[in-house]
Amino acid sequence: MPSGRLQQQFIRLWQCCDGKTQDTTLNELADLLNCSRRHMRTLLNTMQARGWLTWEAEVGRGKRSRLTFLYTGLALQQQRAEDLLEQDRIDQLVQLVGDKSAVRQMLISHLGRSFRQGRHILRVLYYRPMHNLLPGTALRRSETHIARQIFSSLTRVNEENGELEADIAHHWQQISPLLWRFYLRPGIHFHHGRELEMEDVISSLTRINTLPLYSHITKIDSPTAWTLDIHLSQPDRWLPWLLGQVPAMILPRKWETLANFASHPIGTGPYAVRRNTPNQLKILAFDDYFGYRALIDEVNVWVLPDISEEPACGLMLEGPIQGGEKAIESRLEEGCYYLLFDARTPRGAHPQVREWVSHVLSPTNLLYHADEPLQQLWFPAYGLLPRWHHARPGPGEKPAGLETLTLTFYREHIEHRVIARIMSALLAEHQVHLHIQEIDYDQWHAGEIESDIWLNSANFTLPLDFSLFAHLCEVPLLQNCIPRDWQGDAAQWRAGEMNLANWCQQLLANKAIVPLIHHWLIIQGQRSMRGLRMNTLGWFDFKSAWFAPPDP
């Protein structure tokens, strides 16, 4: 019998007997474990051989045998839990232990660095699974970061300074205002072993032509080997940066025929997905990566939903150590939580409603009514970026007849729930009921259901001149809620003629967008890690981080 199954049987037997020595029979024990008398004898002999118990059998009618436990079920359960942790079988660990608080402590104690069979392993604790990693679809902040570790694109944007770097394309040039040429590296391989071909690149870029920022691409062809021409309908100074974004990452041309591609994608990036379950995401360094091979061999993201109840935890790489020493990387996000008024509903479009609601739900009001741990993480927002002060909150009078408002946000985000509760209480003081809708992220991103106001958080990446407009423009919800000439704005942005500060100020002037709070992004640990630099998404580039090897 496998060791794990035998351990489970012993724990069950120990629990049924309360761990006490007793006189019993094979039949009675077999009934307890729902097995045959013969199988029960085999179990007892095997457990005795392991030193877990003694079984003093008595032969004869009416005779009772003595069962003595030498090992406690709790001790064996702990040993079994340790084995499951080492094997990264978190789902079985949760079933074994049952108590989520105990599971959490076990996970935290095993976070951080592990050195096994010459391989460096990093374990991270996170609060939700990441089922969808498919570029070009609605991806949240963390999925966006993970996708960048799995896939490559023609270009790459440096996370630290926003500068453009070579990736699949080693050089590029603008042939004319409407034609860009990219020169691709040969010999690149996908994680499943096949060599990258030009058709993979062309099909990947063609599939995203329906997205607003890529809709001006009219033709993609290859005039010579490993040369790619991209034809545009209007000039775009940002095209090389655009082709370094997650939607433009390169997929195998027949990706739709590959099983579970969204959760187990195949790219050409520094890490390949090995496992993606509700309890764990495991990615391994790709030995045939065309760039510098990652120094951390394996990254395990352990999922424990209950930690979402503690918004201050941030990204946890290592548990507490003796003496209370803390190793924390933090930064104020380039972005904010904000309210979005929906012009498609009468209440959402009403200027007086916008003015009054933004007054009642002002950043200072939210901060004042938040719990102390959150007050330390929140900073009042008066613009989309921390350095901007575009919002001009007025006194505002409550519109006559306003009795209810509908607020919508997406699931699995504890701070959205906290903010919504505070908003509900503040509005209730004015006899306004806040109806709250919590929906899937895909639904939220599409913005096709009815809501007066929407709650969102935006994290802008470097360079901000690129990402601020690109991020807002690529979310269908915003285009649905804010009636304006988005195509005209995009043309102006592509031409480099947009004053982004003025453009954002326009959105805030009519209260289409109301900034609420800036949030401190936090990474707890890792004391022994080198090269860890937090990016604007609250994560760090796995392939650039490393551990000093253990002492010989």
Swiss-Prot record:
<dbReference type="GO" id="GO:0015833">
    <property type="term" value="P:peptide transport"/>
</dbReference>
<protein>
    <recommendedName>
        <fullName>HTH-type transcriptional regulator SgrR</fullName>
    </recommendedName>
</protein>
<dbReference type="InterPro" id="IPR036390">
    <property type="entry name" value="WH_DNA-bd_sf"/>
</dbReference>
<dbReference type="Pfam" id="PF12793">
    <property type="entry name" value="SgrR_N"/>
</dbReference>
<keyword id="KW-0010">Activator</keyword>
<dbReference type="GO" id="GO:0003677">
    <property type="term" value="F:DNA binding"/>
</dbReference>
<keyword id="KW-0804">Transcription</keyword>
<dbReference type="InterPro" id="IPR023767">
    <property type="entry name" value="Tscrpt_reg_SgrR"/>
</dbReference>
<dbReference type="GO" id="GO:0045893">
    <property type="term" value="P:positive regulation of DNA-templated transcription"/>
</dbReference>
<dbReference type="GO" id="GO:1904680">
    <property type="term" value="F:peptide transmembrane transporter activity"/>
</dbReference>
<keyword id="KW-0805">Transcription regulation</keyword>
<keyword id="KW-0238">DNA-binding</keyword>
<dbReference type="InterPro" id="IPR039424">
    <property type="entry name" value="SBP_5"/>
</dbReference>
<comment type="function">
    <text>Activates the small RNA gene sgrS under glucose-phosphate stress conditions as well as yfdZ. Represses its own transcription under both stress and non-stress conditions. Might act as a sensor of the intracellular accumulation of phosphoglucose by binding these molecules in its C-terminal solute-binding domain.</text>
</comment>
<dbReference type="InterPro" id="IPR000914">
    <property type="entry name" value="SBP_5_dom"/>
</dbReference>
<feature type="region of interest" description="Solute-binding">
    <location>
        <begin position="163"/>
        <end position="493"/>
    </location>
</feature>
<dbReference type="GO" id="GO:0045892">
    <property type="term" value="P:negative regulation of DNA-templated transcription"/>
</dbReference>
<feature type="DNA-binding region" description="H-T-H motif">
    <location>
        <begin position="26"/>
        <end position="49"/>
    </location>
</feature>
<dbReference type="InterPro" id="IPR025370">
    <property type="entry name" value="SgrR_HTH_N"/>
</dbReference>
<keyword id="KW-0678">Repressor</keyword>
<feature type="domain" description="HTH marR-type">
    <location>
        <begin position="1"/>
        <end position="116"/>
    </location>
</feature>
<dbReference type="Pfam" id="PF00496">
    <property type="entry name" value="SBP_bac_5"/>
</dbReference>
